[in-house]
Amino acid sequence: MVVAREEGAGIGAVMLLDLGADDPALRFVGVVEGAVDARVPLLEAAAQVVREAGGRSLRWVEDTGEMPLGAVVALEELGAVAGDEVHRWWRHEVTEGMPAAPTARGAAQPAAEGASFRVGMGGAWCDVEVVGDRAVLVHDRQEEGTAAALAALVSLAVRQVTAESAGIRAVETCVAPGDDVFEAALVSLGFAPTTRRAVEYHLAWGT
């Protein structure tokens, strides 16, 4: 763990994970948290730790919606390269209305840490977290399923969170590249893709 501090208080951190890969360029990944302004010194320090451990690169994921242009430029100057898209955020303005609620009720399930609740249907589920006036859905499923079934699940999650939490103005969720079924479900409910996305960054150095 590499931590950035300001006046004794932690303002950011990089948790380094050793995947044990034989290729030193693929061995280490980082989980970055905290202030965007601390990114460059944090990553420089993390890269040094990885280098001393025998790694030849560091990979991590950044949410571009939370990064000002100055931070993007600073990462480029550091030598970090933006790579593949991990997921893109989709958004629905609640004031636009939702289709009629499904007649089926999802089964109550234990929610992930930080989530307000979880709804599930079959082998699919959504954890729902309230962040200010936004509801954030984290979706997962065991099988591909159908767009209609996923739309019913998302509709149920949206209706439950708007009924239980006053002031929700928008619902957001993320979609992985190529997940056409989930995209179709979201489109049917009035969701639209945004410019916010998560991408994998890669910082490499010589031997």
Task: Name these PLM-found stretches.
Residues M1-E44, M121-A147:
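Conserved donor-binding loop and adjoining core beta-sheet/short helix segment
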Residues M1-L16, E76-D133:
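Amide-forming acyltransferase catalytic core, primarily the GNAT-like/NAT-type
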Residues D23-F28, G55-V61, R134-L137, G167-C174:
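Hydrophobic beta-strand segments of well-ordered beta-sheets in folded domains
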Residues E33, R59-G70, Q142, E172-E183, ...:
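Conserved beta-strand-loop-alpha-helix junction that forms the acyl-donor binding cleft
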Residues T64-D84, P177-T195:
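Conserved active-site alpha-helix within GNAT-family acetyltransferase domains
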Residues A112-V171:
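Intrinsically disordered, low-complexity segments enriched in Gly and acidic/Ser/Thr residues
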Residues T146-R159, I168-T207:
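Hydrophobic multi-pass inner-membrane translocation pores used for secretion
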